[in-house]
Amino acid sequence: MGARASVLSGGKLDKWEKIRLRPRGKKRYKLKHIVWASRELERFAVNPSLLETAEGCRQILGQLQPALQTGSEELKSLYNAVATLYCVHQNIEVRDTKEALDKIEEEQNKSKKKAQQAAADTGNGSQVSQNYPIVQNLQGQMVHQAISPRTLNAWVKVVEEKAFSPEVIPMFSALSEGATPQDLNTMLNTVGGHQAAMQMLKETINEEAAEWDRLHPVHAGPIAPGQMREPRGSDIAGTTSTLQEQIGWMTNNPPIPVGEIYKRWIILGLNKIVRMYSPISILDIRQGPKEPFRDYVDRFYKTLRAEQASQDVKNWMTETFLVQNANPDCKTILKALGPAATLEEMMTACQGVGGPSHKARILAEAMSQVTNSATIMLQKGNFRDQRKIVKCFNCGKVGHIAKNCRAPRKKGCWKCGKEGHQMKDCTNEGRQANFLRENLAFPQGKARELSSEQTRANSPTRRELQVWGRDNSLSEAGEDRQGTVSFSFPQITLWQRPIVTVKIGGQLKEALLDTGADDTVLEEMNLPGKWKPKMIGGIGGFIKVRQYDQILIEICGHKAIGTVLVGPTPVNIIGRNLLTQIGCTLNFPISPIETVPVKLKPGMDGPKVKQWPLTEEKIKALVEICTEMEKEGKISKIGPENPYNTPVFAIKKKDSTKWRKLVDFRELNKRTQDFWEVQLGIPHPAGLKKKKSVTVLDVGDAYFSVPLDKEFRKYTAFTIPSINNETPRIRYQYNVLPQGWKGSPAIFQSSMTKILEPFKKQNPEIVIYQYMDDLYVGSDLEIGQHRIKIEELREHLLKWGFTTPDKKHQKEPPFLWMGYELHPDKWTVQPIVLPEKDSWTVNDIQKLVGKLNWASQIYAGIKVKQLCKLLRGTKALTEVVQLTKEAELELAENREILKEPVHGVYYDPSKDLIAEIQKQGQGQWTYQIYQEPFKNLKTGKYARMRGAHTNDVKQLTEAVQKVATESIVIWGKTPKFKLPIQKETWEAWWTEYWQATWIPEWEFVNTPPLVKLWYQLEKEPIIGAETFYVDGAANRETKLGKAGYVTDRGRQKVVSLTDTTNQKTELQAIHLALQDSGLEVNIVTDSQYALGIIQAQPDKSESELVSQIIEQLIKKEKVYLAWVPAHKGIGGNEQVDRLVSTGIRKVLFLDGIDKAQDEHEKYHSNWRAMASDFNLPPVVAKEIVASCDKCQLKGEAMHGQVDCSPGIWQLDCTHLEGKIILVAVHVASGYIEAEVIPAETGQETAYFILKLAGRWPVKVIHTDNGSNFTSTTVKAACWWAGIKQEFGIPYNPQSQGVVESMNKQLKQIIGQVRDQAEHLKTAVQMAVFIHNFKRKGGIGGYSAGERIVDIIATDIQTKELQKQITKIQNFRVYYRDSRDPLWKGHAKLLWKGEGAVVIQDNSDIKVVPRRKAKIIRDYGKQMAGDDCVASRQDED
């Protein structure tokens, strides 16, 4: 009976009992064979519940098959039974066991062949990525399969949506699996618009490439024939290598994985970018006092992804910080779970935890008891590998059950231990038999309910046993999906055995609700009426029972009359004969729409906004609307216990007398958790493929069909007021998604997607585009079949409570969808009418621009720049705007364009995409995307100016990138471009301009006006032309400035300027030089700012001054522009600097530059040290560092310090040139002691530690777990010197991070001075000197040597001060106020100065002159008066 319930359902059991044991034999399979098989599996320590599914049977067969050759007859019989059961589960028709074994063998052979075929297909490329495989062609050559548009599309979306948050890195890593450098560059180029991020990335790549070149020097001599050259850093980055070379390196033997190396560099750069965009440390992530544990875990893992550490370190961080930074309530529970708890167990345990701390203690105790047993509130399905521990009731040993126990039978009850009754008659509630091979969720065995939220969190297949009756009303809107039966409590979860109290013949009994049992069987009891004997099959074989008919049973408040069997059953069972009468069913989660759990933001409470007064007609309208909504179950009335409120009001519908209810959810929206938008953009008709049959549907009352989370409903409360407070106000809350609430769109979209998924899988030929409640359904079926499918879809939606009203069901073209008009072979935007007005307000212009932007996607040539100019500045919406002549002209042109209706066509995947761009002038561009000429898919415009100064080539590349990105989003691939620029012009700009970004494949098209560079800067100085040295200076306070030039022919000029800046004066100087020079000119500036602007060759600018410079440049025949560093004593530059600095700059020339340069050549000091020691401006000191070829590669070392106490040192061994360097770092200051040691032994390390302790106060040393540090010699040395030794974990902020960083810096300095020393040990000591005394920065701007002395001195002073304070507190003070002759006190002495003392009398702190205070020592007795004792102590 129980086995039948758990293994085979009724229909399958009939099939089982028809199968013969042997071919043409008489005996057939019976229920007892399943019972026997389950017992045998227990004997072999295999989970018997695997028999319940085909997959489980397949797993058992896999375990048994290897043992068949040597196994016993019993094992073979078990294999045969399980094989037959597998065929029954899989609905494979077999007549006997032999046929079943043949079918199994046939299936195994097929799967083997498939595996072999897959292996053959994959070949050696099994390790190659599936995204971008390098495959072998028919000729045996390794060829590259280009990156897919789908992958590019995914990458662009990730960057646009995540905006360089931590998730970008794992996403990039996944999408770029196995990519070549060319693929990686394509990925980077598609997001080239993010210029700041890309510049950071470029810098990282350059640094890593330089490091690669340093570590992999080029081998001298020619390359041997047939050998490949070794890749340089720039080859790995794909800039100087071809695709074939990259493939060659990656497939060579041995391979050089250039793709993986480049990917690693990019990820390093992305880490930096992520750090910039989300600078949160994992240490800052702490759980709020009331924050749900699940939300805390989400934040924790999001930040963890951004941490720059290896996976091992991240695992350690998770183990340590996740529990450590939880709030006290959760931390108590997590510690009780033990160190080996999984994340799922943690989430389960902390579900709903919060409130008083005693609640957490109670839960912790409960959890510690639960964790001691084998089952921890988790379904068996979650941990498939766990074996059930079988324990004998008789002897108590593990491994067998009482029936098979060989020990003598134990007297008394196995359940409670008392004599006089057996276990089946036991009334003790303590422990229950392990019936039907199910684990109890709680050891106490009491039936407890878990909330549906917990069930969903813990169980992958949420099952609930629900009991209902037809007379019960619906408890929640949106849950009644059956039509005939409405749900009501109780809902009994299957988290544990569903045991309920039932009333039978006036007696109360606990019984198990068993939907798998046919009959109701109860343990021995007296029932009224006649009975007849019967035999039934049970777990332990057959049992004899008494059958009573027409017995009244009450279950959960529902009555039923039926047959009851009474006999020796180990547990009372209510079977299907009674459960069906009371309407009990087993429910899986696919019935009603599952509510999405919603929370408020951590630490926030619901809205409490007062309802404002409403007019009588509005109140009447709201009452009428709410009454109707309440009848439909969308809202329900609430009492005064709900403290939350949101204001409600009513407006009249457009062109109607009907009213519409609006709720102002702004306050609730601020307090509600954030949601991830499922859809970030709307689908575009140009991306639709042409379909034979099309239908457009609209979901009616979309939001009101989806239930709102029960726990969140209280926050949606609103109130309808009454006139003059006649009656109490009516209060409601929402049961469904409200209009205007921030969560409604995301929850509706995700619910709708889940509901449509099964229909899409069943009907792959149907294309469904879903955006909110609009559905576009297309297919290539004949119209009749298509309409049948549409009806199926409507019925499918109706099952889930979504209606598709006929009024909005569009069957015939043109279809109105998402603001578009769709025809069978073309599309357009819905008709656009531009208003005719005499006066335009700001709001009118905004609406007009919106309409024109919408029209521009199919009407080519639309312009809005002049209209947008009218909206500049902060203006009120109702302010009247006067149209300029340019704006009127632009509007008239747009009206002309819109007169003729224009249509777009649909996408054909078999044809290429082509995009053509034209220049319209005034920084505006228009483009068309098509597959066939004159049949546009879509059109558009671009008019964005990314910088203040730009030129047409730069704008053209920006327009191209916009079109490419748009194409990837709509069609998943980039088009071929036709651009109005000649190749020569493009190449001239591309080669010179450092910030030039990638554009896809393109060709020149002669569509005037052509894009051209209006002037060209020369690459070399112009011989014979006059050279102008230009400079400018401005005073920040007075805003006065000068600009001027000095020429190599003795000419000079200076002009005075007012209200200016340094940057403006530098540009003004260049303008002067261009004005006063001939057709050819050389200009030398020391301004990087001016150089950067002019080298980009702008032809338009928002700056009037730059526009004037552009005019002058266009007039010239040749211009050469050069930059020199300022204050370097360069002839003309120094003269003009003196000229413009007079009376403007406070500091002129500095004598210390030469000395600083000499010092830097010897010690390679950083710029802070030089600025401090030689009194140089930072810009000059930085320039000296930048011009040093040994310092410019890596830039500045950061001197961030860990906040540690003064006595802590970190020690570590590092290796260089095959020798060992032992490094000690004073953590608080960064001061280094280092030595080359002959061997990494305990003896050498101990000697070094004793030397260190003899020089500096060492209290604690922190080391790794190296054998030299853990040796007894080092321990003995530390014990003798009184040093505490600690061992750390790598990268723990209080562990080895500081010394690891210092090792790197020390090696860098050694590299800079290595050529100055013959031996490494000399170079090490030189590097230590430079680091400790020639590098400044970090805390206080000191060098490390200055900092350690300062820290130790401060520590000594602080300790001495503390001693004095402690000493002072042993005194009492009696004092007199100015007018009062009486002595007051005693008071506490806080400080004793020369002329006064600071005292504390009660809570008041006072300053009293010394002459009016008597200070006495506290001897523990009361002392008062101006006596000799007090006098003697006066001067103490």
From Swiss-Prot:
A zinc finger (Integrase-type) spans 1151-1192. Residues 490-494, 538-544, 577-589 are annotated as: Dimerization of protease. Its cofactor is Mg(2+). The record marks G221, P222 as: Cis/trans isomerization of proline peptide bond. Zn(2+) binds at H1160, H1164, C1188, C1191. Residues 815-823 are annotated as: RT 'primer grip'. GO terms for molecular function: aspartic-type endopeptidase activity; DNA binding; DNA-directed DNA polymerase activity; exoribonuclease H activity; lipid binding; RNA stem-loop binding; RNA-directed DNA polymerase activity; RNA-DNA hybrid ribonuclease activity. PROSITE patterns: ASP_PROT_RETROV (PS50175), ASP_PROTEASE (PS00141), INTEGRASE (PS50994), INTEGRASE_DBD (PS51027), RNASE_H_1 (PS50879), RT_POL (PS50878), ZF_CCHC (PS50158), ZF_INTEGRASE (PS50876). Protease: The viral protease is inhibited by many synthetic protease inhibitors (PIs), such as amprenavir, atazanavir, indinavir, loprinavir, nelfinavir, ritonavir and saquinavir. Use of protease inhibitors in tritherapy regimens permit more ambitious therapeutic strategies. Reverse transcriptase/ribonuclease H: RT can be inhibited either by nucleoside RT inhibitors (NRTIs) or by non nucleoside RT inhibitors (NNRTIs). Mg(2+) 1 binds at D698, D773, D774. It catalyses: Specific for a P1 residue that is hydrophobic, and P1' variable, but often Pro; Endohydrolysis of RNA in RNA/DNA hybrids. Three different cleavage modes: 1. sequence-specific internal cleavage of RNA. Human immunodeficiency virus type 1 and Moloney murine leukemia virus enzymes prefer to cleave the RNA strand one nucleotide away from the RNA-DNA junction. 2. RNA 5'-end directed cleavage 13-19 nucleotides from the RNA end. 3. DNA 3'-end directed cleavage 15-20 nucleotides away from the primer terminus; 3'-end directed exonucleolytic cleavage of viral RNA-DNA hybrid; DNA(n) + a 2'-deoxyribonucleoside 5'-triphosphate = DNA(n+1) + diphosphate. The record marks 132-133, 363-364, 377-378, 434-435, 442-443, 489-490, 588-589, 1028-1029, 1148-1149 as: Cleavage. Residues 1202-1352 form the Integrase catalytic domain. This is Gag-Pol polyprotein. It comes from Human immunodeficiency virus type 1 group M subtype B (isolate RF/HAT3) (HIV-1). The lineage of its organism: Viruses, Riboviria, Pararnavirae, Artverviricota, Revtraviricetes.
